[in-house]
Amino acid sequence: MKKAIFIDIDNTLLDFDKCAYLSMKRSFEDFGLPFDDSMFDTFERVNLSLWHSLENGYISKDQLFKIRWSTVLAALNVKADGILMEKQFKHYINTVAITIDYAKEILEYLSSKYKVYATSNATYEQQISRLKNADFDKYFSGYFISEKVGFEKPSKEFFDGCFASLPFSVDEVTMIGDSPTADIKGGVKYGLDTIWFNHRGESLPEDIKPKFTVNHLKEIENIL
């Protein structure tokens, strides 16, 4: 019998792509730099690659934040200070909370039946601030943010850290998330039932097998 839910934040509950787009646009405006959609495409490509490197243990979070914007700006051939851009981007991303469709409703539903815990590889300050701004914090029984846990998803150590403070067994918890690697692969390897939120209509690598797949958050109500 399920008693608790682990649920990812970015691109599962909060639309990170839209939040990042707005934060990048505002940051570029602050620095007097031109901005267009193709520039954001470059940011997404670089950012995703760096987060995959983090998940695989190739770089630390501090390294990611130090090189992210210098890498993006170099790829765009834009002359600006990457460290200052990172600081400005974080200023905006910490406050912007654009939600995924039906996120509020699914949190209301899940929290009425289970203990719900947020899981994330982003920074604690950023995620707590954004969840509060979205008025989502009231639905959670706790937060497992890698910065506090000490390890990143999808590592075994991350999930060990989660369960160390919980009265639940692995078979009593379901993991929900959009990332095939961080959320689903990590959850499956740990022995959790998983629900892959595939809102982009992507295909999965053959070695990643979620128990359930949904394309809209409302579909979770038919599973849990």
Where do the protein language model's features map onto the residues?
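N-terminal helical cap/lid subdomain that shapes the substrate entry/recognition surface
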Residues: 2-101
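A generic structural motif
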Residues: 113-115, 192
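Asp-based, Mg2+/Mn2+-dependent phosphohydrolase catalytic module
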Residues: 1-5, 18, 80, 108, ...
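Catalytic-core regions built around general acid/base machinery
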Residues: 102-113
